[in-house]
């Protein structure tokens, strides 16, 4: 059974991005539950889609599974991967839209600040116990 916390975290981020009103439309999509990644083409009327994988690192899902779910042929993805090339090329036309696919958010250098903030919270709790 799926833990709802993962979905809630993504939906909270989507709401925060929507609140900034920098993009015409912001929609969450998921690998294993609706709305699915392939639904991104019908989830918006926007002609351009920027797909940002909410993963801590680039790995199997981000470099193989998601490009295939976005319509990239599996054989092409595997061939590019074996050659050490990116498995997605920006922008790529799919279903009448242009799709840009980014790296996982965990590759963002600013994430260090979030990690340190959490560590400081832990250190603060520890200092109260000592």
Show which residues each predicted segment covers.
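Active-site-proximal alpha-helix that buttresses catalytic centers in soluble enzyme cores
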Residues: 1-130
């Amino acid at each position: 059974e799926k833990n709802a916390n993962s979905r809630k975290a993504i939906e909270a981020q989507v709401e925060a991005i929507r609140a900034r009103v920098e993009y015409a439309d912001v929609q969450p999509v998921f690998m294993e539950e609706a709305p699915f990644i392939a639904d991104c083409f019908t989830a918006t009327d926007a002609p351009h889609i920027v797909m940002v994988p909410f993963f801590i690192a680039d790995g199997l899902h981000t470099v193989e599974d998601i490009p295939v779910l976005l319509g990239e042929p599996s054989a092409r993805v595997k061939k590019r991967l074996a050659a050490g090339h990116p498995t997605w090329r920006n922008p790529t036309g799919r279903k009448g839209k242009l799709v840009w696919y980014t790296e996982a958010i965990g590759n963002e250098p600013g994430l260090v600040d979030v990690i340190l903030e959490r560590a400081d919270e832990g250190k603060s709790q520890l200092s109260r116990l000592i």
